[in-house]
Amino acid sequence: EQVGIPDADRVRILEILESWFVRRALVKASSQGSNRFIVDMLRHLSEQPAERLADEVERFLVDNHTAVGYLPGDVEVRDALTDSNVYWNYRRSRLRMVLEALEDARRGYPGTNPLAMGPIVRDKATVEHLMPQKWRTHWDDGLDEEQGRDRDRRVQQLGNLTIVTQALNSKVSNGPWPQKRAKLQELDDVLITREALTGGDDRAWDEQAIQQRTDRMIDQICRVWPAPEGHV
């Protein structure tokens, strides 16, 4: 029951649980037995006073070290995402959810000082590669075979992905970078895309840029869905 739980604590409980769910999803932690784990947590919480529920939710998750219930720390999240082929390793809906949350964070949502007129509209965008999967058509750059294999892997990394409308996606999908960049700058209002477009020259979107953006996005993920201070 929620009777007697202060509003601030209720929000904090939801934030803690959301971090637990999302972090476990990102590191692909096992969900087998999760129903029983949640029942055990609810049973434990039912014995606690309302004013301590938020602290008890956090403590219950932090103190749990079983495969079914542990809360992944920043290091594990970073290890799972840094070199990951995220485009194919995660369901598209889950990947879009992460990108939408990162976009909301850049817009100042949720928060008391939003920087945009509103959060991004859910479920309207598609996941787009900045460097296209078919990069050999316009992005060959004279790479040798090994470098080509590395680029095939890099284009699926988190740092090469953004969200665009379906209509814009069809206009820019596989084009060369100068035209694609110009079209995105002209028509796209997604802030996580605009960050990738700022600075550098027309040929600056390469493996190094993708890795640097991947690292920044992982940092943001760890802030959007934080672990309790000191949790590793």
Language model feature labels by segment:
Residues 1-101, 201:
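A cross-family structural signal marking well-folded subdomains
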Residues 2-3, 13-24, 41-44, 60, ...:
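Generic, well-ordered alpha-helical scaffold segments in large soluble proteins
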Residues 7-15, 19-26, 36, 72-73, ...:
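C-terminal, well-folded lobe of enzymatic/effector domains
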Residues 27, 31, 35, 40, ...:
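General "foldedness" signal
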Residues 57-202:
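Betabetaalpha-Me/HNH-type nuclease active-site subdomain
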